Amino acid sequence: MTYICKYKTPSEFSDILINSDGEYLTGLWFEHSRDTLKHMIDCEEKKLPIFKETIKWLDIYFSGKNPGFTPKYKINNLTPFRKEVIDIMNNIPFGETLTYNDISKLIAKKRGIKRMSAQAVGGAVGWNPICIIIPCHRVVGTNGSLTGYSGGIKNKVALLALEKNDMNKYFVPKRGTAL
């Protein structure tokens, strides 16, 4: 069974939907993101300890602070490549960013290969089922372009600003993905 709970965010953000298998956090999405409906099918609302823990994390985060803990989560269908990307995203400090290319270089170095596709990294970043907590919003284009966020570019900009990033380093392209 999949359980769901809704989190009311500050006004500059879309609200958030949280999924659980009853024990672990299994999904966290902005309510109006492109895949929202598929995460609401066959879900039951229920008060769960994992929802309480996740809401505590979100409350701290949306107050502009690094929560300092991570709710226990489980990701289904996690390939080794996706795990590498998620592990790197989990190590991007609060208030900092990496580029898709930075991540591809880290993976290539770890694997002992010359190159890794930044586009493949983008696919793995976009696949992330637990936004914010696994900070895919901290991954940006090489030139500072803010594209590729399934939660919507408005939310990505607001998340980076909340973390006190220097927003002069970034721009929203006129055309691109996830605008």
Residue ranges and their predicted role:
Residues 1-112, 116, 162, 166-179:
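Basic nucleic-acid-binding alpha-helical/helix-turn surface characteristic of O6-alkylguanine DNA
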Residues 116-158:
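Short glycine/serine-rich loop segments
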